[in-house]
Amino acid sequence: VLYPIFKMLIFLVIGVSIFDILQTILVPKRCSYLNTYDSGKLSGFYNEEKNEIDILIEGTSHSAGGILPMELYEKYGIKSYNLATGIQSIEVSYYMACEALRTQKPKVLILDVGNLYISDATEFYWRMVLDEMHFGRNKFKFANEYCKQHLDMDKLEWEIMFPLFYYHENWKILSQRNFRNNTNTKRNYDKGGIITSTIAPAGLSVEYMNEVAENLLKDNERFLFMYEGEEYTETYNENKLYSVDIPDKNIEYFKKLQELCDANGVKLLAVKVPSLNLPQSYRSAWTREKYNKVNKICEEMGIEYYDIMYEACLEIDWGEDTWDGGPHLNLNGARKISADLGNYLTVNYDLPNEPNEMWDKDLELYQEVRNVALLELEKDFITYINLLINECNDKMIFIAASDDMSNGLNEIDINILRLLGLRVDFSQALNNSYIAVIDNGEVRYEALSNRSLNYEGFYGLSNKKYEIYSSGWYTNSQASIKLDGIEYVVNSRGLNIVVYDVQRDLVVDSVCFDTHTEYHTSVRNNSIVNGLRQKFEQYIVEVEDQL
């Protein structure tokens, strides 16, 4: 009697295992180090120790890259986790909170209220969370809400619950990447925080954004002057260009989130991470009108609200602290936000501050990635060379001049270059070619000439070949730094610098400082720099975090 039952159980276990393997292969591969704000959040969160997280963070991409949990831990000892995802609607925040509270008992849940204005999140952004949520009651309710809001879809609820059925056609586009793990099987060292190491200045001020919003709010009438042959007509009708009204459905879910927090003894803190853009072209631009609206709603609901954009005593430099022209903050801005928010939390909430060995190890990995990002973000010549001296003395540094690299150098600049180990007479360098190679803090090669220069050698643990070329203004103004045949140089006027991590076999930065002028303007290719930082973080995640 037991044998048939035992046999059936074996077949069931085998069937479930095959189902799970196929599902893992077919689900799109997402990696937290690719700057996709909506990947790896729940999967990494599930791997945290039970009841270890004191602060949960939810919201859209503004808070995903604007609040860094490891900054909170480093400075204040606060253990937090960032569950914010791209275009995260308030419904998604609610169901993620339901799921998070199954394994954690946080003291505070932070919600970035920008998502109160999201009413049309597409299928893609819901799926990012659904795919990673564990099977259970919360996922069932979440999938049910998902189906209600996407009535135009022909997917059944069970197809939403099980990604294998949803992504079954992906077998047509399988690649090697599909056979790697879909999500993290260990803790996320960054606790869901996203580091961005590029700069794209905003083209407007907060004052101008609010001025535009005020004008848009006043313009509620549409007119049309039309000629059809000899006939002329004028029509006027009500038509709002801009509104700060919040959909009723979003208010309803905001209340449900409040009730969920109350039922679980969690303090709900509404915040807003700064976001700057023209309100008519970017719906998430955080105008003062939106701040006033949300502030009033929070007062009526009895929810604590801290608007970091309009209430905090900090100054965002919109020329340096954003990576996409204003909407999102880079590491510079995120560190300011995290420091301010950490101070607010410690002053207003009774939070534990206890050392944790595992978190300390995660912090070390975070600091490694942050150091690379800070190097890539640095625009000041003196500060950058100091970073090379103090933080990169275990790296290889390749330097090639293009056009002219000495006209703008002053005594302070030359002294700092001397500390780096460079010895040429820079007073003789005007319009000339120049090459330097520094390895582990020692200058291996340095040359200055009024003719073009070529130099090659071998680098790294695998003894790969590097090739360097420099030509000054008299000889065609070019620079090249190739590592293993791959070009990394910016090739702009001045000192072109490439920094290579020997132990990890990775280039970590490529920059040019225009030392022909006194301003030493830095030049970087943002897409290349993003790629370098991502490869470094990938190494941290896939190699060092697995040791």
Regions found by a protein language model. Give the residues of each.
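Active-site segments of SGNH/GDSL-like serine hydrolases
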Residues: 258-283
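Active-site-proximal beta-strand/loop segments in catalytic clefts of secreted hydrolases
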Residues: 58-61, 83-86, 112-114, 271-274, ...
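Secreted/periplasmic serine-hydrolase-like ester/acetyl group-modifying domain
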Residues: 129-264, 353-373
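Membrane-embedded segments
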Residues: 58, 62-148
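C-terminal regions of proteins
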Residues: 284-363
